[in-house]
Amino acid sequence: GYEGVDKRIDVLATAIHAGLKATQLKDLDLAYAPPYSSAKDPVNMAGFMIDNIAKGTLKQWHLEDMDKISKDKSVVLLDVRTVGEFNRGHMDGFKNIPVDELRERINEIEKGKPVYLICQSGLRSYIASRILEGNGYETYNFSGGFRFYDAVVNDRALIEKAYACGMDLSLIHISAPTR
């Protein structure tokens, strides 16, 4: 949502001015007001995510990887959203195992193949990634989640905003989600 965005911008501007590294955002001690924010501030959460990526704890895959991954049968494509979310729209070739069922259904995921994960925003696929990594799987989490993917596929102008820093958009082919 938009509530509190000004606070996050102030915090990030101060961090930039102070010369903090992105991985240090996780260590900021920010004011906590339960009615107005989560226990961990979104700035801290961004810092944790950046730290996980920097340390290699979390490996990501991106929108521009979609075409080469979806055609490659040497990987497992796994959507960990609820059945209802999956049925409202999903990427072609993805199997649906909700994260809440993952531990009980882990034997349905072929060992020895990298697992490419997606959920709605990234949290559940991160949790699934940790569960699978703990059981010997190599995992990659989709950056941005299905919400990002669906918005980009359904609004080409949005990708131009998302990649406004000079990326050649003609190199990106995006398949529409299955409905």
Predicted segments, located by residue:
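C-terminal catalytic lobe of FAD-dependent flavoproteins
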Residues: 1-25
